[in-house]
């Protein structure tokens, strides 16, 4: 997973849990049942886990380009 993929995964899990929480709260408030809110947030968390935990291809679209290492010559000790 690259840096852009991490950013996308973070957006997905945050918005998934928030949307499921808000919808669950509204339906739970209308029905006067707190368990609906709890199960809605649990479902959102589970869906978020399925979407974000595996390293899907959509999270690996911007691979890192590493620089070549700089080879430094070892200093010689002339004081001996």
Swiss-Prot record:
Single GO BP term: protein targeting to ER
Domain of life: Eukaryota
Keywords: Endoplasmic reticulum, Membrane, Transmembrane, Transmembrane helix
Lumenal compartment residues: 31-33
Family: Belongs to the SPCS1 family.
Subunit structure: Component of the signal peptidase complex (SPC) composed of a catalytic subunit sec11 and three accessory subunits spcs1, spcs2 and spcs3. The complex induces a local thinning of the ER membrane which is used to measure the length of the signal peptide (SP) h-region of protein substrates. This ensures the selectivity of the complex towards h-regions shorter than 18-20 amino acids.
Protein's UniProt name: Signal peptidase complex subunit 1
């Amino acid at each position: 997973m690259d840096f852009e993929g991490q950013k996308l995964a973070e957006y997905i899990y945050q918005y998934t849990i928030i949307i499921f929480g808000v919808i669950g709260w509204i339906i739970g408030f209308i029905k006067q049942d707190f368990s609906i809110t709890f199960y809605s947030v649990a479902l959102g968390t589970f869906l978020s886990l399925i979407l974000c935990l595996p390293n899907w291809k959509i999270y690996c679209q911007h691979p890192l380009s590493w620089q070549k290492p700089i080879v430094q010559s070892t200093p010689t000790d002339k004081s001996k």
